[in-house]
From Swiss-Prot:
Known function: One of the early assembly proteins it binds 23S rRNA. One of the proteins that surrounds the polypeptide exit tunnel on the outside of the ribosome. Forms the main docking site for trigger factor binding to the ribosome.
InterPro entries registered for this protein in UniProt: Nucleotide-bd_a/b_plait_sf, Ribosomal_uL23-like, Ribosomal_uL23/eL15/eS24_sf
SUPFAM superfamilies: Ribosomal proteins S24e, L23 and L15e
Pfam family, one: Ribosomal_L23
Protein's recorded name: Large ribosomal subunit protein uL23
Gene: rplW
Lineage: Bacteria, Pseudomonadati, Pseudomonadota, Gammaproteobacteria, Legionellales
GO annotation (BP), single: translation
Family classification: Belongs to the universal ribosomal protein uL23 family.
Keyword rRNA-binding: yes
A GO CC term attached to the entry: cytosolic large ribosomal subunit
Subunit organization: Part of the 50S ribosomal subunit. Contacts protein L29, and trigger factor when it is bound to the ribosome.
MF-aspect GO terms: rRNA binding; structural constituent of ribosome
Length: 95
């Protein structure tokens, strides 16, 4: 596994209070070709935490319209990361 790729896999956090506060689950937007083991290693390396499980889903882009012009948002991949008990990520600080 290339170390540089680990830092490119996580694109952005998808912040939701419900997931983080109640279940210790964090949601990230990830690269569409990222696999679960890659996502797990990327989160563990960047945030120095222990990951319990990773679930992923592909989100279809919405069809949009501006007057007569139709467009489409891009498809993207979402990863649900469950941390081990006692682990926590401070998304606002980025650590």
């Amino acid at each position: 596994m290339n170390e540089e790729r680990l830092f490119e896999i996580l694109l952005a956090p998808h912040i939701s209070e419900k997931g983080a506060l109640t279940t210790g689950q964090y949601v990230f937007e990830v690269m569409p070709d990222a696999t679960k083991p890659e996502i797990k290693r990327a989160v563990e390396k960047q945030f120095n935490v222990t990951v319990k499980s990773v679930r992923t889903c592909n989100v279809k882009g919405k069809t949009t319209r501006f007057r007569q012009v139709r467009g489409r948002r891009k498809n993207w991949k979402k990863a649900y990361v469950m941390l081990a008990p006692g682990s926590e990520i401070d998304i606002a600080a980025g650590e």
